[in-house]
Amino acid sequence: MKKGNFMFKVLLMLIAGIFLSIDAFAQQITVKGIVKDTTGEPVIGANVVVKGTTTGTITDFDGNFQLSAKQGDIIVVSFIGYQPQELPVAAQMNVILKDDTEILDEVVVIGYGQVKKNDMTGSVMAIKPDELSKGITTNAQDMLSGKIAGVSVISNDGTPGGGAQIRIRGGSSLNASNDPLIVIDGLAIDNEGIKGMANGLSMVNPADIETLTVLKDASATAIYGSRASNGVIIITTKKGKNGQAPSVSYNGSVSFSKTQKRYDVLSGDEYRAYANQLWGDKLPADLGTANTDWQDQIFRTAVSTDHHVSINGGFKNLPYRVSLGYTDDNGIVKTSNFRRFTASVNLAPSFFEDHLKFNINAKFMNGKNRYADTGAAIGGALAIDPTRPVYSNEDPYQFTGGYWQNINSTTGFSNPDWKYTSNPNSPQNPLAALELKNDKANSNDFVGNVDVDYKFHFLPDLRLHASIGGEYAEGTQTTIVSPYSFGNNYYGWNGDVTQYKYNLSYNIYVQYIKSLGANDFDIMVGGEEQHFHRNGFEEGQGWDSYTQEPHDAKLREQTAYATRNTLVSYFGRLNYSLLNRYLFTFTMRWDGSSRFSKDNRWGTFPSLALGWKIKEENFLKDVNVLSDLKLRLGWGITGQQNIGDDFAYLPLYVVNNEYAQYPFGDTYYSTSRPKAFNENLKWEKTTTWNAGLDFGFLNGRITGGIDGYFRKTDDLLNSVKIPVGTNFNAQMTQNIGSLENYGMEFSINAKPIVTKDFTWDLSYNITWNHNEITKLTGGDDSDYYVEAGDKISRGNNTKVQAHKVGYAANSFYVYQQVYDENGKPIENMFVDRNGNGTIDSGDKYIYKKPAGDVLMGLTSKMQYKNFDFSFSLRASLNNYVYYDFLSNKANVSTSGLFSNNAYSNTSAEAVALGLSGQGDYMSDYFIHNASFLRCDNITLGYSFQNLWKTQTYKGVGGRVYATVQNPFIISKYKGLDPEVKSGIDANPYPRAMTFLLGLSLQF
């Protein structure tokens, strides 16, 4: 009986299984269909997915697709540039995709307003930081590096929290600022840093940035007038949304940094061998027995962290966003560190059915720097005797803190027991240079602004916009140097440098937007006033602990300063569109600057731009493969008044230094001296012509643009030498000449692969720029030049760069080296270029320049399901560098390795060169081609969503990722790093290679 029951149950189960299978089979159907756009053209490569599953396919070249689905399923069809469609499943489906108007109407922020991307007439590029880039940048400038044609970003060096040199289409000036104007949420920022803060971009945490817009040509920048000759970078930060439930985001990372490359100097064993080769058994002084790698003593593997938390949300009419950030960035040079705390608040309330809108922004940053004495540390590590130990407990070294140093006996101090001191003319212990100097800076910066926008009830086309904003920043750098130190032995040093700045800005403008049939008008007029104030002082002293008296005191009253300048402006803009095809933009701005005398105070800066949407013409409207084609033409004039001195046109007296005092009895009083002035100073003016073509194919799957430009700057401002006795100084700021930049830019963005599971985004840009000085006021003398650039290590304050007519700014100005038949330089033998029978300064010539002729950038991002992989590359061609390291070591004779009773190290490269230091440092031999290909970063990530999801909780989404920054450089340049902003490669703080692990979460 039991057996019968069992068989009966098995039979029932089999029958049930058969019916279930039949039912399931009945639900499964084959879906066939075609996807077209609104013009009836097939959409190739559209994604067709069963909603809520991984089942899907893509359309073929005719727009057809086929897949299996169940009755009741929803089919989701999507493609780039179209609105996604969700449709119930059917055996035969005809899907029509409509253009995504949000993409077509994408708005780009420009000066004092915004415009549809499709209606822009100037050379403007906007980028939105990718969600997949979160956490891999600690500075806003990193987001621009290699991403935009015509924009060069070179970090100053590897210093934690260090700034960067940003150039848009080369420099437009010689001595005035070449930095672009930075505008953050509508407020133009003073780009001059203070102690502890590199520049205005340090103010913004990269995680808070929504978009970066770069205005490149004068037709786009002229609305900013005299502050826009070098382009404009507009940063818009993230904001909340109306009615949005609160959401919390977190981004965090930990990173490990190390040196990518080190200088190749002789080891202790190699140095002893070479010394024996030079002197034999007649060494001028004993060598040590150690084998110290001094670079190991100053470099380290550094661990850094970064955290950022934000809360977004919005009540009915009050969107809000609050964010906090903390960065702890340890440098690869021991003791160096940068800590940054940022906070930002945005409120955007609206009233009267959105007729009255407010936008309130407040940002705060506190930065704490611990600076390493990089010059002393790296210079010492490359020069000090490698046969000596780091520390010594011998008696003389108690006066150097137990660190081994080259020392001399002394009786020059008041304490008779202090019998030894450091030899000031010898290389110093690099670790002591770091550990015996505590150099810290603390800075606070607050930026806030309130925008009010009112759309008139009786005339909704008319808007009134008013804004008031300001910045307050303070920074103090405190330097404490031990009395056991190399440079301040016995006395030490304790001093402060304090700086303050506060700026105020307010503007008001009215805007009228009206459409009349085929005519669209956008008219704006307004005014603005900006005030900039700076003040500060220095104070400090050494201390004689034996006599209890100060030494070499620097007094606040001798160093205190205060300065200010004001800019008053009036501006207007007209945008006109006919038939949504023909575009016209005209702007005008008048600036009055307090930096010039009343006769030269005002500058006029107009611009004009034309645009033609060729794609909208009837002869191209039906060419579906072409999604965009627009021609742009622009002309404009911008100005420059950022000359560093607010009162260069006024006769002023300034306080002398402490060495120029006058005695009255037993008291010494500070004196004042007249300062050079030039009441004829006037504006630099830069005129720019631009022609561009924007294109798009396959409904935006391929987009790009090409631009050609010509820019000429007249009345260049520069500090030049003047005849003795003609003014109160040997140098004075003057308008000295003209400078030209012209070039081409090309950029392209593509999605080569778009499938259900895999997408590939690729961006490439290339820039060619030519820079040339066309006029200097030195007359017609072909040999006239203006000395420029940084000093090199050898010589007496020697510079090897110059401004000269017919050549690029900051070109190298050197002697032409003579070589033997083997290609080796013949020491102290140069070409007599002027043919006068002797080698003199007239034989120097212009040879190469630091700025590259061609810049390129490539970014690749791939996504496969939840995984992503990306990398960024940058290249520079024909940028040249003065190889200061080799030049400084290029004396491997006995006098080069031993002088002032101390040994100095050298390199194998210098030994092979075999020079003996007879003045070759101004030779073109040391100007090296530093073209390079650099990989900025490589990232692998994994995204997840709906983690811990419940019926009442949406779950947690996020991403984990691993990044390596600066993994490799390909270059023939033998120095530490081919990317040198000044062109003089003189022991900079090395750029690190960094390994980073990060986590992003959305709650």
UniProtKB/Swiss-Prot annotation:
SUPFAM superfamilies assigned to the protein according to its UniProt record, in alphabetical order: Carboxypeptidase regulatory domain-like, Porins
Upregulation: By maltose.
Superkingdom assignment: Bacteria
Cellular localisation: Cell outer membrane
Pfam families hit by this protein: CarbopepD_reg_2, Plug, TonB_dep_Rec_b-barrel
Stretches assigned to the TBDR plug domain: 116-238
Keywords attached to this entry: Carbohydrate metabolism, Cell outer membrane, Membrane, Receptor, Signal, TonB box, Transmembrane, Transmembrane beta strand, Transport
The UniProt record lists the keyword Signal: yes
GO molecular function, one term: starch binding
Domain TBDR beta-barrel: 243-1003
One Gene Ontology biological process: starch catabolic process
Signal peptide positions on this chain: 1-26
Pathway assignment: Glycan degradation; starch degradation
One cellular component term from this protein's GO annotations in UniProt: outer membrane
Entry membrane topology: Multi-pass membrane protein
Main location as per UniProt: membrane
Effect of deleting the gene: Abolished ability to grow on starch.
Binding partners and assembly: Interacts with SusD.
Function (record text): Mediates transport of starch oligosaccharides from the surface of the outer membrane to the periplasm for subsequent degradation.
Protein family membership: Belongs to the TonB-dependent receptor family.
Protein known as: TonB-dependent receptor SusC
Organism the protein comes from: Bacteroides thetaiotaomicron (strain ATCC 29148 / DSM 2079 / JCM 5827 / CCUG 10774 / NCTC 10582 / VPI-5482 / E50)
